[in-house]
């Protein structure tokens, strides 16, 4: 995941070097997501059929190829190709990697895999942005140092995966289908649909930071220090990692509710920072919003992981990432297309207002759901989940969760995890 955020702090340098617009920056960012979603739709469930190890090995070799293209890039076309290959590599790996971490979780700590997935994603993205941001300020050609090192790292990781034990026994005689589809098993559907509003809100603010924050910091907040954009991105993701670990101490409902509140407050802070403008307020907004992303994301991954089986796990996690990365890319691409006409300041302000609206939607959705069990699952009859699924089938959107109260612990307090 460090590789996904590594190009972001370098985008302003690429713009100076090859003279392209903010719109092209978001296009370069968007093709990464196109490649990622294409791989998720076709290759995401393959690790359930072939096993985790061969899929991860292929993904690491593709990732090494993408960083090698970045390393030797000579123009915008090279960036587009490298970012697309990088997206395919990430999409190939990410469903199987999340499922594999759940496979390795012990019976005593069943949420360890999903916690590692959520926190590891945040820490990796933070590390990539922070290190590259500091290199932008320190050396003349940071891309040469970054992508040559990452190419070597991916090759070493491929060697390590070669010796990794396999966790899935591939079913004999079952054909591998690469049809682009996402299927959510019935038993996982109600939890998946309940997670959608928070996933969309969190990943939309992530898209703002990965695609536009270095340009916003320089062009709207008027910060000339080259590392500032990368450090703001790192602040968002480090806070997300802390929020992810914090969410393990709460029920899913409580974690998601608190996360939605923080996302709303963080979005408001970002809007104020852009209006003033204030780099300090922007950084504070990044921290608050990042904590909200971590809380909601980890809580929902935890809940979804509990209602999947080993055979369907990577397929379900692939669907989670399809929703997440669509939210990551589409608003950012729209902002890039609108920026030349409306200006970067107005566009970024409207962007964070959009994120704040989504956060409020997630907050209302979670507040109306009174699921208090260890995973936030309805403790009454399964009719609540059936109603949610039926509502989604009629309208094409996730309906509100049906209110049920789960029994409290012996001391009268709601059940907790951790």
Where are these regions (language model features)?
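Symmetry-related core transmembrane helices of the 12-TM Major Facilitator Superfamily/SLC fold
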Residues: 145-160, 348-364
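Helix-breaking motifs and short loop linkers at transmembrane-helix boundaries and internal kinks
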Residues: 19, 51, 72-77, 273-277
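Cytoplasmic helix-loop-helix junction between adjacent transmembrane helices
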Residues: 84-120
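Helix-loop-helix hairpin linking two adjacent transmembrane segments in secondary transporters
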Residues: 112, 116-162
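Conserved MFS/SLC helix-loop-helix module at the cytosolic interface between two early adjacent transmembrane helices
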Residues: 37-74
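A late C-terminal transmembrane helix in Major Facilitator Superfamily
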Residues: 303-344
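C-terminal transmembrane helical hairpin of 12-TM major facilitator-type secondary transporters
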Residues: 255-298
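Paired small-residue
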Residues: 77-86, 280-288
């Amino acid at each position: 995941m460090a590789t996904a955020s590594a190009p972001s702090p370098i985008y302003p340098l690429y713009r100076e070097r090859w003279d392209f617009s903010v719109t092209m920056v978001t296009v370069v960012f968007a093709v990464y997501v196109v490649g990622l979603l294409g791989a998720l739709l076709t290759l995401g469930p393959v690790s359930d059929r072939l096993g985790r190890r061969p899929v991860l090995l292929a993904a690491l070799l593709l990732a090494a190829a993408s960083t090698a293209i970045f390393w030797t890039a000579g123009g915008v076309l090279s960036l587009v190709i490298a970012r697309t290959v990088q997206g395919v590599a990430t999409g190939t790996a990410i469903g199987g990697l999340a499922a594999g971490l759940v496979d390795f979780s012990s019976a005593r700590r069943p949420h360890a895999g999903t916690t590692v997935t959520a926190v590891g994603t945040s820490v990796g993205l933070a590390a990539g942005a922070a290190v590259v941001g500091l290199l932008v300020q320190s050396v003349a050609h940071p891309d040469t140092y970054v992508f040559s090192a990452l190419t070597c790292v991916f090759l070493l990781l491929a060697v390590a995966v070669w010796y990794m034990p396999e966790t899935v026994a591939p079913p004999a005689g079952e054909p591998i289908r690469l049809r682009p589809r996402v299927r959510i098993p019935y038993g996982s559907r109600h939890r998946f649909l309940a997670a959608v509003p928070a996933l969309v809100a969190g990943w939309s603010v992530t898209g703002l930071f990965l695609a536009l924050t270095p340009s916003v910091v320089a062009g709207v907040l008027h910060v000339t220090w080259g590392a500032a954009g990368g450090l703001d991105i790192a602040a968002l993701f480090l806070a997300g990692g802390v929020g992810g670990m914090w969410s393990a101490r709460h029920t899913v409902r409580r974690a998601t509710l608190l996360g939605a509140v923080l996302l709303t407050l963080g979005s408001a802070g970002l809007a104020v920072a852009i209006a003033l403008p204030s780099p300090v307020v922007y950084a504070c907004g990044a921290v608050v919003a990042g904590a909200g992303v971590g809380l909601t994301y980890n809580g929902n991954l935890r809940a979804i992981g509990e209602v999947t089986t080993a055979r369907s796990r990577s397929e379900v996690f692939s669907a989670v990432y399809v929703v997440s990365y669509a939210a990551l890319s589409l608003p950012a691409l729209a902002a890039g297309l609108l920026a030349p006409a409306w200006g970067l300041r107005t566009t970024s302000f409207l962007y964070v207002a959009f994120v704040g609206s989504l956060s409020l939607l997630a907050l209302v959705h979670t507040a109306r759901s009174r699921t208090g069990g260890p995973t936030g699952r309805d403790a009454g009859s399964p009719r609540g989940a059936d109603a949610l699924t039926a509502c989604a089938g009629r309208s094409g959107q996730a309906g509100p969760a049906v209110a049920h109260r789960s029994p409290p612990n012996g001391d009268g307090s709601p059940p907790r995890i951790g």
